[in-house]
């Protein structure tokens, strides 16, 4: 069984919708980390640099769900709109601590059309 890490860096106002959409597309869980950062066009106010708040959402997903999750979130949450966020996926070489999830995944694989 192969897994990917899907990471979404999004406006905190989109977090709930991103999680709901990702779960609807096959994600089984998430981790949300509060963060801040700047984009390509830095924000300034009275000469001071302003860092935007962002949520970093992590999803460990089955490899075959990665594209569906990313496409669904990108479309439903308008990730391509400026300021909404970005998404990336990374290969996971090794994983532990997912025995309950793997059991559920195996059950789901019996009924899924790949």
Give the predicted meaning of each segment.
Residues 1-114:
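Positively charged, small/polar-rich N-terminal and surface patches that mediate targeting and assembly
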């Amino acid at each position: 069984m192969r897994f990917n890490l899907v990471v979404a860096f999004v406006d905190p106002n989109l977090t709930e919708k991103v999680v709901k959409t990702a779960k609807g597309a096959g994600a089984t869980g998430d981790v949300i980390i509060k963060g801040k950062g700047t984009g390509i066009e830095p924000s300034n106010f009275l000469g001071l640099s302003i860092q935007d708040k962002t949520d970093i959402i992590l999803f460990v997903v089955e490899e075959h769900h990665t594209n569906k999750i990313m496409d669904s979130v990108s479309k439903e949450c308008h990730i391509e709109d400026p300021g909404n966020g970005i998404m990336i996926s990374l290969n996971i070489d090794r994983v532990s601590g997912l025995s309950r999830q793997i059991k559920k995944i195996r059950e789901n694989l019996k009924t899924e059309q790949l």
